[in-house]
Amino acid sequence: MKIGMVSLGCPKNLVDSEVMLGIIKDKQLDITNDPADAELIIVNTCGFIESAKEESISTILQMAQYKEEGSCKYLIMTGCLGQRYADELFESMPEVDAIVGTDSFTDIGWVIDQVLAGKRVKHLQKLESKNVQAPPRMLTTPDYMAYLKIAEGCDNCCSYCIIPQLRGPYTSRPYDEVMAEARSLAAHGVKELIVVAQDTTRYGEDLTGKLLLPQLLRDLNELEGIKWIRVMYLYPNNFTDDLIAAFAECDKVCKYIDIPLQHASDRLLESMNRYDTRAQVEELLAKLRERIPGITIRTTFIVGFPGETDEDFAELMDFVEKQRFENAGVFQYSQEEGTVAGAMENQIEPEVKENRYHELMALQAGISEEIHQEREDEELDVIVEGFDEENPALAVGRSYHEAPDIDGNIFIENAAELEVGQMVRVRILQGFTYEMVAELV
């Protein structure tokens, strides 16, 4: 039996896919990267916003074609979309043989057995019975990097977000379990450890009543073999002085702050059920830049949130222009059923959202280009991720300033002798909006 896996959505979902692949491997089943060759296909879906739902449905229908044209006999849906719409999808998509919820994916071995026995399965567990899974994992990332998921669920309850309903309340993984997995990843040659959760700053609060991320970073910093520790999804309301100190003092912790801010208008922040005002965020950002030399700050913003006026948007533009973030992602608000914001009456017209999106993106593009040009002649350590298809002597890599998949790349000239996963010292020659060009030092 050959099994194929298609993983959609965020890195946290990818970790779930890797856990499922590890379970499948333990069952002595073959795993293939080619869906056309698979007899059973698992699609780990995303259901966060409308575009993600559309991609998930499209992928499932595409995989279902292999039942007619390929080797596929069975199709299993896992992840957030299945959790959110299990009843409707089970009825409307007969080509799907099983739907598995976000809290029951570790039962994938049992689900496969049921499907192979000819049963059609809808397997959902109550989210309160959280199963925050330890290894085994079968890594699908390059050998030199891996994600380390430290918690599941979310307690922030932002008014636009469906995640707490899909993933349940915030549940930290046991500290010793997280460290054991990190040591295992280091022993397998991982150089870049990327710490993820829906909210990494809240880690440990439900275990001990204390925020444990600062101590976790200090302990991870002692692991042999690990070169970079990158932390994603840091929320501003739990960014303590101790956490700032951990970033500043731990040499392996990347001076890279991924902190979703979403807006700068106090009125909209309150409507979003965010915990901070613009003034509080500005105070935190000033403290971060003062105490962490060489810091890069990445953030995300939502435009077109219900009730966003021209004045609100102008305030956001002013905030971004003054803060000069190194990297920022911009999203058009997606009206999601089941959320507080989705039921608000003052929804923004799509054309207005689109215009504001392009205006903010253009502003940020100019800022990013200026920052990249300011880095010309600077020396950086870069991890090699591959080579340009048209010019094999041009290596492609990242420094601590860039997270995989979401930030830009650094192109290294005359680098044909380098190897993927190698860390090298480079000098920046030219900076552009999303990329930089460098030479070996």
What label would you give each PLM region?
Residues M1-Y203, D242, I257, A279-E290, ...:
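Proteins enriched for Cys/Gly/acidic motifs involved in redox and nucleic-acid/cofactor modification
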Residues C10, G204-G225, S271-M272, Q335-G366:
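Radical SAM enzyme [4Fe-4S]-AdoMet core and its adjacent flexible, acidic
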Residues L75-G79, R84, L89, A187-E311, ...:
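Conserved SAM/AdoMet-binding glycine-rich loop
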Residues M93-P94, V115-G118, L211-L213, F247-A248, ...:
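Short, hinge-like loop/turn segments at secondary-structure boundaries
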Residues V178, V195, V231, I259, ...:
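Conserved, mostly hydrophobic/aromatic
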Residues A197, Y233, L261-H263, T299-V303, ...:
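Active-site proximal loops enriched in glycine and acidic residues that flank catalytic Cys/His/Asp
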Residues A343-V441:
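Terminal RNA-binding accessory module
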